[in-house]
Design a protein with these regions (language model features):
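Short acidic-hydrophobic, aromatic-tinged amphipathic segments that line or gate anion-handling sites
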Residues: 81-84, 171-177
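Short glycine/serine/threonine-rich phosphate/pyrophosphate-binding segments
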Residues: 125-132
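A short glycine-rich beta-strand->turn/loop micro-motif centered on a GG-aromatic cluster
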Residues: 119-122, 140-155
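Active-site acidic carboxylates
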Residues: 1-88, 92, 103-108, 134, ...
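Gly/Ala-rich phosphate-binding loop of Rossmann-like dinucleotide-binding domains
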Residues: 137
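Short gly/pro/ser/thr-enriched loop/turn and capping motifs at secondary-structure boundaries
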Residues: 88-89, 127, 150-155, 179-181
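Glycine-rich phosphate-binding loop signature in dinucleotide/nucleotide-binding domains
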Residues: 100-116
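Structural motif
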Residues: 15, 116-119
């Protein structure tokens, strides 16, 4: 008799981190507009898959907020935004969103499991993205860095950063590969919506891959 159990996603406990995608950085970052394209796709997927989104800004009072192109998607995903001065996104305010809290009688279980699969897009690959990934790995989480969703001021920094992160234990992959790995099964409820998203963004995906991975 066929198993009628509904299929589960391959990656079940995820969070998406969007790192420092601010207006002031846009002119200086190599292929920044292509990073935006990938971030938009990832955020649309987060809405469909109900994956929580966390955003940081670096010293927003001086460097401004997140780029306008991402704001509507951040709003519909209910993203949490944290301002910081550290380079890593894994600041105490961020950790508090993932930590269990202790009550007077017993521990109150967090809505998040102890081990997450954290997906990172943003800038700069060799500074804030790298330090965020290293801190998350040290905290026991799995890290997915989307190679078509990160960049730096100097393009030569990007492959160096990604090579280091692979060596440290992060998974360096593409946004489309991550999407299909997240689902794991074409029978999950959200498959049709994600397949439609992939089709709608296929031209942007090709542009981003061609631009950001051309030297890798």
């Amino acid at each position: 008799m066929a198993d009628k159990t509904p299929p589960e996603r391959r990656l079940k406990h995820q969070a998406i981190f969007v790192c420092d995608m601010q207006d002031k950085f846009a002119p200086a970052i190599w292929q920044f507009d292509k990073v935006v394209l990938t971030a938009q796709k990832v955020l649309r997927a987060a809405k469909i898959l109900n994956i929580p989104v966390y955003v940081t800004t670096q010293n927003a009072a001086r460097l401004g907020g997140t780029v306008a192109a991402l704001e509507p998607l951040l709003a519909v995903t209910g993203a949490t935004t944290i301002d910081k001065t550290r380079f890593s996104m894994w600041v105490p305010e961020m950790e508090q969103h993932f930590a269990s809290t202790a009550g007077s009688a017993a521990a109150v279980v967090s809505k998040f499991p102890e081990q997450l699969q954290v997906v990172i897009v943003g800038i700069e690959s060799h500074i804030c993205v790298t330090q965020t990934a290293l801190d998350l790995l040290a905290a026991g989480h799995d890290v997915f860095v989307l190679a078509d969703g990160v960049s730096s001021c100097n393009e030569q920094e990007v492959p160096l950063a990604l090579a280091r992160l692979r060596a440290e234990g992060a998974t360096v992959t593409s946004s489309e590969s991550w999407l299909y790995e997240t689902m794991g099964d074409a029978a999950i409820a959200e498959f049709r919506e994600i397949a439609k998203l992939v089709k709608e963004t296929s031209a942007d995906t090709k542009v981003a891959l061609s631009a950001l991975l051309s030297k890798m």
